[in-house]
Amino acid sequence: MGIAKIPAVLWLLACAVLTFAVAISPAHGGRTRRHYDFFITETNYRRLCHEKSVLTVNGQFPGPTIYARKGDLVIVNVYNHGNKNITIHWHGVDQPRNPWSDGPEFITQCPIRPDGKFTYQVIMSEEEGTLWWHAHSDFDRATVLGAIVVHPKHGDTFPFKRPDKEIPIILGEWWKNDVNHLLEEMKRIGEDVKPSDANTINGQPGDMFPCSRDDTFKVAVEHGNTYLLQVINAGLTNDMFFAVSGHRLTVVGIDARYTKPLTVEYIMIAPGQTMDLLLEANRSLGSKSNSRYYMAARTFITLPVPIPFNNSTATAVVEYYTGDSGAGPPDFPAVLPSLDDVDAAMAFLRQLRSLGSKDHPVHVPTHVDEHMLIDLAINFLPCNATNATDTACKGPKGNTTRFAASLNNVSFVSPAIDVLHAYYYGSGRGVYEDDFPNNPAPVFVNLTGDNDRPGVTKHGAKVKVLEYGTVVEVVFQDTSFESHPMHLHGFAFYVVGLGSGKFDDRRDPATYNLLDPPYQSTVSVPKAGWAAIRFRADNPGVWFMHCHFDRHMVWGMNTVFIVKDGKTPQAQMLPRPPNMPKC
C-alpha cells in the first residue's frame, strides 16, 4: 500500500510510534546504538488564520526529539516522501572522522531525491546537553527540524542540580508564504528575503498573534521544582532575546558544552545556538499572586534602516499547579530587552564561561599554528554580474544591484557535486579551489558607520586545507551592518575574544580569555565588531563553515575546511559508505 493511500490519522499515528518506539541495540565498538526512522512528508498546518502545506518529519512540526547518551551511535533512516531534494544536518555533533553523515547539501553529500532513502550514522563523542537537527537544503529547515538531547553516560550525572523535568524549547519563525518560493524570489530579483510573519515557540506564535491563543504552548510547573529548559534558536533570520516573567534563568550549557552557572534575567541566543537553562519554580502562590507567566522570545536586530518587520513577541505560558481555574492573564517579562538593544546582547555574551571542572576540563590551545583573519561582508553586485541578460533584478541601490555576501572577498558557490566526494577521490579540479585566503584583500572599511562593500567580492568554491592537528585561530571581523552567527561543522571551538570595532592584532590578543572561554560551535559576531576562536584540527574530513542567517549562506558567506588524515588509523577519515546519494 502506498503511503499516499494511508488515512492521515493512521499515518500520523504510525509516525508517532516510529518516533517514540526507538530501538536500542547492544553496544557496538563500545557505543550503544539508537535507531530512528524519519519520513519526510508534506503536511498541512494552520497558523495566523492561514493554512499551508509544509515539509515535516513524521508529520510533526517541530519534528521528533532524538534522545541519546554521551558516546552513543544514533542511526537515522531518512525516507524522502516529499516533493523535493533534501538533506539533514546534526547541528553541533562533531561526527569524529565521519563527514559522510554531516549533511550539508553539495558539501558532504548530494541530496536525497524524492522517493529516495539515506541512512545517517550520527556519532556522539564529547557532547552533553542540547543540540538539534535540521534540513540543510534550501530554506527547508524552517519546518524540518527538531531537538537532540544528549544525556551523560550511565553512572555519570549533570554537573548541576538534577532537574525535575526537561523541556525542549524551540524558537523559530513562521511565514504565511511558502519559504522556498520566497527563496527563489530572493535569488531571482536579488533582494532580501521577506521578514517572517511571526516568531514561534515550539511551533506556536502565542497569544499576541491572530488565531493563535488557543494553541499557545504551555508549560505546567509545580512550586519548588526545578526545570531544565533546552532552548534552541532555529530561526532562519533572527537573533532572539528570551526571558520568563517573574523568574531568573541560570545558564548551565551552550551548544552541548557545560558552562559556569550564570544567573540572568534574559538571554540572547543566535540562530544555530542552543542553551541549557535552569528555571526554579519559586514564585509565591498566595491569594494575590499570579500563577501564570509569559515565556517570551523577541527578535534582536541590528539593521540600521527601517524594515517592514512585525516586532510582536512570541509567547508561551508557564502555569503553576494551583487548582484555580480562574487564574488571570499571564505577566509579561518587563526585563526583556528592546528590539535593537546591542548593549544588552553584548553584556550577556561577555559573561559566558566554560565550566572548567575536574570532570569537564578546559583545554585552550596556547600555541597557534595558523592565523586567519576573515572579513564578513554584505556586498552589492551589479545586476548583470552573473548573467549578462539579467532583467529581473530589483535589488537595492535603485534596482541596479543584487545582494551578495562574502568571506575574505569570496562569495562561495556550491559545486554541482559534493566537495567531500571530489576530495575523497582526488578529483577536486573543477569542483573546488584550495586557496581560500588567510586574510582579506586590502580594502578600506569604515566601521564607525553602517558599512557595505559594493562589488568587492568574486564567486568561487574556495576551501582551506589544514594538516591534521593544526591549531587554528580565526578572527571573524564583521564589516557589515548586522551581526553574524558563524557556525563550524565538525568542531567545537573556544571563543577566546569578543570586541567592538576593528580587530587590532597588537592590542586585542592581550584581552583574550585563555583560562575558561566558552566552548561553542556557533559564535555571534557582533555588528562592526570581532570574535576570535581557537580549535585544533583533529577531525579529518570536509567541514562546512557558514553564517547561520540562511539568506547570508545563500548569498555566499561560507567556506569549507578540509582537514587531512593523520598518521594513525584513528586519525583518518572513515571509508565512504556504499549508499551515498548520487548527484
From Swiss-Prot:
GO terms for molecular function: copper ion binding; hydroquinone:oxygen oxidoreductase activity; oxidoreductase activity. Disulfide bonds: none annotated. This is Laccase-21. Cu cation 2 binds at residues 91, 134, 548. PANTHER family: LACCASE-14, MULTI-COPPER OXIDASE. Gene3D superfamilies: Cupredoxins - blue copper proteins. Cu cation 4 binds at residues 484, 547, 552, 557. Its main location: secreted. Lignin degradation and detoxification of lignin-derived products. Pfam families: Cu-oxidase, Cu-oxidase_2, Cu-oxidase_3. Its cofactor is Cu cation. Belongs to the multicopper oxidase family. InterPro entries: Cu-oxidase-like_N (IPR011707), Cu-oxidase_2nd (IPR001117), Cu-oxidase_C (IPR011706), Cu-oxidase_fam (IPR045087), Cu_oxidase_CS (IPR033138), Cu_oxidase_Cu_BS (IPR002355), Cupredoxin (IPR008972), CuRO_1_LCC (IPR034288). It is found in: Secreted, Extracellular space, Apoplast.
